[in-house]
């Protein structure tokens, strides 16, 4: 059983998402948060295995709520949105930067073409993400700030000059 929390300020969307999760016996919805702040408090109290986090909510959007969750009570977060007008790649990077594991679109209604397949993929994503181990974020800097294998981001590293005979040796000359 995968206990999860839904964070969505729309009663209709929260009920719809709850019905999707309840349709799969592997999920159990622990509760619904109506704001980002409420989501953070509910995660601390309920300790779900996964959070389905809406982007646009009062009391802190899904990104700020995800940051707070990852700083206090790390748990896998999947950010979802029905707003498909924005660039999906941009939203995905914002979700990852906040600490979410992924960003996906909310499934369309049951009359949409491919509805069953879309819901199956949606639920499969949550099942996979619920098993991911997450840790508390203690440093908010960029990757360029972190040392890697003893080489700092400021080290003047230079690749060696290529072998002039390489192309001929590999038959690509």
Locate each region found by the language model.
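Strand-loop microenvironment adjacent to phosphate/nucleotide-handling motifs in alpha/beta enzyme folds
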Residues: 1-173
């Amino acid at each position: 059983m995968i206990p999860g929390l839904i964070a969505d300020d729309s009663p209709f969307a929260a009920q719809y998402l709850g019905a999707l999760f309840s349709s799969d016996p592997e999920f159990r919805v622990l509760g619904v948060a109506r704001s980002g702040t409420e989501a953070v408090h509910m995660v601390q109290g309920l300790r779900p295995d996964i959070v389905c986090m809406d982007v646009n909510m009062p009391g802190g959007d899904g990104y700020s709520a995800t940051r707070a969750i990852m700083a206090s009570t790390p748990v896998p977060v999947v950010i979802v949105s029905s707003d498909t007008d924005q660039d999906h790649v941009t939203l995905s990077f914002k979700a990852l930067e906040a600490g979410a594991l992924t960003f996906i679109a909310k499934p369309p209604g049951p009359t949409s073409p491919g509805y069953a397949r879309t819901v199956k993929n949606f639920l499969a994503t949550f099942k996979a993400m619920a098993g991911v181990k997450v840790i508390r974020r203690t440093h908010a800097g960029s990757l360029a700030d972190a040392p890697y294998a003893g080489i700092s981001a400021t080290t003047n590293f230079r690749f060696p000059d290529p072998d002039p005979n390489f192309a001929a040796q590999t038959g690509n000359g």
